[in-house]
Regions:
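Acidic beta-to-alpha connecting loop that harbors the catalytic carboxylate
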Residues: 7-9, 35-36
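Active-site phosphate/pyrophosphate- and oxyanion-stabilizing loops and adjacent acidic/basic residues
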Residues: 18-19, 57
C-alpha cells in the first residue's frame, strides 16, 4: 500500500491517509507532501514529475517486478514545512514525537482580528472554566470567511482562532 497525503488537506483526506496507513497490516508506505492547500496538491498531482517520482517506481516494483529499489525506500517520508525539507522514518508516528496538550482559554491573545481572538494554554482549566461564544456565520460574511480591511483581503477576520503565547524555541508540529 502506498498512501500519499498532503498537509494542506488535513481536514478530510490527510486524516484518512494516516488512519488507513495505521490500520493496514501488509507492506505499507506513507508520503505526506508539503502542499499547502487543495489547489497546490492538485497542481502537484497534475505534473508528470510527480507521477515519475512517486507513483511509477511503486507500480514498476509491484506490478512489473522491476528491481528498482522501491523496497529500500523509507516507510515514511514527510515534508517538513517551514524548513522546506523532507524527513524519512521507519514508523508513524515518528519515534521522537512528544505529546503536549493545549487547552482553550478565555483570555484574548491580542494577536489577530478574528471572530474570537482566543488563546491556547498548557495549563489545564478548572472544571468550571467558563465558556466563550461568537456569532457564526458572521453577519458581515458575504464572500466566505475572507474579510476585507485597509490592507486588502484578511483571511482570518471571519474565522475562529486560538493562539499560543510566543514560543521560546522553534517547534515542529508533526504527528497525530
Amino acid at each position: 500500500v502506498l498512501s500519499i497525503g498532503h498537509w494542506g488537506k488535513m481536514g478530510l483526506h490527510l486524516r484518512g491517509n494516516i488512519l488507513g496507513y495505521e490500520k493496514v497490516k501488509s507492506e505499507k508506505h506513507l508520503v505526506v507532501t508539503g502542499a499547502k492547500d487543495v489547489f497546490e496538491a492538485h497542481d502537484q498531482f497534475d505534473h508528470i514529475w510527480y507521477h515519475e517520482q512517486e507513483l511509477l517506481p511503486f507500480y514498476d516494483y509491484h506490478l512489473k517486478g522491476k528491481k528498482n529499489g522501491w523496497n529500500k525506500r523509507p516507510k515514511v517520508r514527510l515534508h517538513v514545512g517551514g524548513r522546506d525539507e523532507w524527513r524519512e522514518d521507519a514508523v508513524w508516528p515518528p519515534k521522537e514525537a512528544k505529546y503536549k496538550s493545549y487547552y482553550l482559554s478565555g483570555k484574548k491573545s491580542g494577536s489577530v482580528a478574528s471572530l474570537n481572538d482566543g488563546s491556547l494554554s498548557t495549563k489545564k482549566p478548572a472544571a468550571n472554566g467558563g465558556s466563550t461564544d461568537w456569532d457564526y456565520p458572521h453577519a458581515g460574511w458575504k464572500l466566505g470567511t475572507v474579510g476585507f480591511g485597509p490592507q486588502g483581503p484578511d483571511p482570518v477576520r471571519g474565522c475562529v482562532t486560538f493562539t499560543t503565547e510566543p514560543m521560546d524555541q522553534d517547534v515542529e508540529i508533526t504527528g497525530p
